[in-house]
């Protein structure tokens, strides 16, 4: 850093992280965790130090003081659909032990056995500030009326949240995680989607693309691109700067797409963004998209 400004960096797929450490440190952490955390987790946390897994030990330091209230209040992180906690453990360890930050991390997972397993591991390894809770992404009473699905409520998650993460939240669970982040006005949303099943059955090949989309593989790729493109546009309507990119080599995982949103509080003009979203949906014959429906049912969530 020079003169109080971070140096622009170039990340995966040539992405240039201009003007802020708030973006690129998340990319560095996520890529490293996917590659090198699994051996530690497979060992039950006994034989391998998380700190030895990090190939970019100082990558996050320039952004450590960028959070409001840094040093006065903890950085609050929610991992929705935490599963076995691969990234939850890695991120919490990196921020607390590598960067010395005060962090409160909660992994949210529906399966009680995984919640119990991860809590045992966290306690066994003395990871203060990290816990896992059983529940659904959309909690009863929080989802807009008509879109609740019998979700199990969570305890103690009403406070401000700074970072929302979701790794491979299946299909519309990614939309639910993004909506929760928007609702909680999280500073950063980091989601790696998978499955993309919602739009594919609705997708109608427009006349110019019929010859291309008659192939199943092309139709699937088009549905993925459309799904994540709409999600990014919707984030922009809520005051987020949004990017969609590959964050890690496909040799590590084929599910290597990331949606990254950083809250700026400056939303795109509503009419302009709505026109783009509606035009895309009409072009492909899309009748319903989960995040769009959540936002409309809650009358949008205006940025502040």
Regions picked out by a protein language model, each given a short descriptive name:
Residues 1-75:
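Conserved Class I S-adenosyl-L-methionine-dependent methyltransferase catalytic core
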Residues 104-109:
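Conserved SAM-binding motif I beta-strand of class I
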Residues 84-100:
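Conserved SAM-binding loop of SAM-dependent methyltransferases across substrates and taxa
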Residues 72-74, 102, 161:
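Phosphate-coordination loops involved in phosphoryl transfer and adenosine-cofactor binding
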Residues 58-71, 95-100, 147-156:
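Alpha-helix termini
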Residues 3-4, 9, 33, 41, ...:
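Class I S-adenosyl-L-methionine
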Residues 100-103, 128:
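A generic structural motif
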Residues 78-81:
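Conserved S-adenosyl-L-methionine
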């Amino acid at each position: 850093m020079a003169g109080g400004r971070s140096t622009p960096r170039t990340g995966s797929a040539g992405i240039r992280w201009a003007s802020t450490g708030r973006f690129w440190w998340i990319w560095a952490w996520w890529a490293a965790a996917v590659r090198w955390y699994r051996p530690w987790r497979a060992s039950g946390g006994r034989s391998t130090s998380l700190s030895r897994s990090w190939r970019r030990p100082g990558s996050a330091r320039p952004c450590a003081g960028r959070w409001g209230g840094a040093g006065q209040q903890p950085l609050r992180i929610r991992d929705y659909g935490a599963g076995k906690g691969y990234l939850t453990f890695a991120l919490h360890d990196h921020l607390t032990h590598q960067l010395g930050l005060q962090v409160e991390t909660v992994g949210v997972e529906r399966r009680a056995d995984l919640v119990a397993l991860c809590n045992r591991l966290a306690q066994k390894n003395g990871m203060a500030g990290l816990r896992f809770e059983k529940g659904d992404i959309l909690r009863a009473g929080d989802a807009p009326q008509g879109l609740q699905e019998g979700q199990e409520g969570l305890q103690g998650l009403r406070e401000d949240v700074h970072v929302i993460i979701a790794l491979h939240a299946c299909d519309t669970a990614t939309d639910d995680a993004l909506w929760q982040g928007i609702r909680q006005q999280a500073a950063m949303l980091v989601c790696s989607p998978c499955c993309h099943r919602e739009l594919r059955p609705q997708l109608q090949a427009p006349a110019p693309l019929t010859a291309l989309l008659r192939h199943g593989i092309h139709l699937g790729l088009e549905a993925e691109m459309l799904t994540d493109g709409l999600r990014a546009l919707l984030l922009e309507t809520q005051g987020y700067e949004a990017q969609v990119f590959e964050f890690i080599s496909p040799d590590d995982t084929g599910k290597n797409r990331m949606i990254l949103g950083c809250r700026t509080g400056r939303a795109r003009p509503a009419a302009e963004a709505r026109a783009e979203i509606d035009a895309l949906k009409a072009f492909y014959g899309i009748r319903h998209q989960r995040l769009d429906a959540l936002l409309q049912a809650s009358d949008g969530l205006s940025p502040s």
